Amino acid sequence: MEERGSPDGDPARNLEQGPEGSETPIQVVLRVRPMSTVELRRGEQSALHCSGTRTLQVSPDVAFRFGAVLDGARTQEDVFRACGVKRLGELALRGFSCTVFTFGQTGSGKTYTLTGPPPQGEGVPVPPSLAGIMQRTFTWLLDRVQHLDSPVTLRASYLEIYNEQVWDLLSLGSPRPLPVRWTKARGFYVEQLRVVEFGSLEALMELLQMGLSRRRSSSHTLNQASSRSHALLTLHISRPTSQQVPPVDLGEPPVGGKLCFVDLAGSEKVAATGSQGQLMLEANSINRSLLALGHCISLLLDPQRKQNHIPFRDSKLTKLLADSLGGRGVTLMVACVSPSAQCLPETLSTLRYASRAQRITTRPQGPKSPGVKPPQQVENELLRLQEENRHLRFQLDQMHTTAPGAHGARMAWAQRNLYGMLQEFMLENERLRKEMRQLRSSRDLARAEQRVLAQQVHDLERRLLSACPLPQQGSTPVCPCRMVPAASCHALPPLCYCHHFCPLCRVPLAHWTCPRRECHMPQVLEPEAPGHISQSVWPPPWAPPPSPGSAKPPRERSQSDWTQTRVLAEMLMGEEVVPSAPPLSAGPSNMPYGLRGGSGIPNLTPRLETLTQQINSSLHLSQRQPQPSEDTQSPGQGLSSC
């Protein structure tokens, strides 16, 4: 048979051992309500069987074990004694934080267990035999306070969590939702919550009845008085002593204990209860908060929960129960179930929930008074201060043995070193920025200079063409000479007399001399110059062609004309464009413009050299031309066959 849950004993005996400083498990008491009149009419039988005082039998194979198991025949007084609430009250008087909360399905008797049956009318008290845990605890607590030697201050607060909003059930003004805050000293608390001080049982009962009358409830198929909200009533107990001083921080709570009673709304299935509209929204909100509570309980059971994040902030309910579940308080859980077989799925869920909850352990902490310390703590603090004093004296002696000012000098040197490195980095950054600006400026100047040089080359070519007028169309026949396939159309001197021009730039094309005219063209041979290539005696390409009707040979140019042409060519080649800014220092100062300031135009220098060679070749040819005789054949007569 599978048996779940193994508590160490009943709550009363466990709490007698003293919870302070040790791990204390959450105590769970199970109560099975009796069969209702409707269930008896349907002929249902109980699906749960209590085997002794601590075991609940669900089936022959499944059983659950808790601190105490109470069947439907137990009275309210039996439940109060079995839960050990008196011991929780004693711990609250000693300054501990104690919590009692009920959990279970809707209609399982949670509110009845805590507060008894609802009042039959206004001013009609509940019979003493039917009073719940809260009324019995109030009666016992006030009687216990009267027999104490020191005065005790009692205060009460009452709130409900409805649709994830906190409402004050004791508020004197108009009801409004209150925020939940968190501080390191107090943990989670409700801001602006009214706390009422009382001194008698009658005053406390009036506060309880006021809260119960304001609490929201409704009816559905499973419960005629179903609570639609979670309710928390807290009793604050403070016992001032002669050594006690008020807290320094106004956010800190007063020194003392508290006793909190939590009546959770029951979990329900909308399909089973038939809830619609507002009831369905309330059921969803209730189930969502209970699901968050179950998730926190599951994470608290993890052995490595110190490394896990417990999501107490997922709902307002888990925020206010964070200290009771996983903090420094003592917690008692009363699980209420229904014996009906129709509610068996929800009953099993509640049993598993309670079985997991009783395995959660807390570390209760007693009251912390800022003016009073235990003797053991004072002795430990004294030993710690003595050890710290010896350590500081040893460090002081070590500082005296070293050179005076050495530590300060090292610190100053380190600071200066860091400051110097920072200054160097800043200067280097500024230098790089300036160099980048200079490079960009030089790049722009080089591009401008390249454009100027390209324009200069273009002007030189145009001026060269202007010195070589085109022959009139139809004046001379087409020359049948063969063109040399060169990469550049005007890169191979010397030129033939028949002028071929580039169709694009109109520059005379370089080609071999006409083979049909070689026999008729007069040549000047100089055998004394070996390796010398014979040149044509005809005028240069830029000379004007003879007119068709003229029989005279072209006029020979004088030496002064050729000198003037040479001077003109040197002037053309010597022109230089002065840039608006100094060029880049990328090469030597005597480097041609096409190579300064970075990459220039690739064909600029060869084109200039080609023009220079053409002009020099023509000038050289004209100087070596002999004086024409009268019997020499005129050039105009030799053009008849071309």
Swiss-Prot record:
Residues with the Phosphoserine modification: S6, S369, S634
PROSITE patterns: KINESIN_MOTOR_1, KINESIN_MOTOR_2
Positions of ATP binding: G104, Q105, T106, G107, S108, G109, K110, T111
Gene Ontology annotations of biological process type: microtubule-based movement
SMART domains in UniProt: KISc
CDD domains listed in its UniProt record: KISc
Sorted UniProt keywords: ATP-binding, Coiled coil, Cytoplasm, Cytoskeleton, Microtubule, Motor protein, Nucleotide-binding, Phosphoprotein
NAD keyword on record: no
Chain intervals for the UniProt region annotation (Disordered): 1-25, 531-561, 579-642
Cellular compartment(s): Cytoplasm, Cytoskeleton
Biased composition (Basic and acidic residues): 1-13
Similarity-based family: Belongs to the TRAFAC class myosin-kinesin ATPase superfamily. Kinesin family.
Protein name: Kinesin-like protein KIF12
Protein's organism: Mus musculus
Gene: Kif12
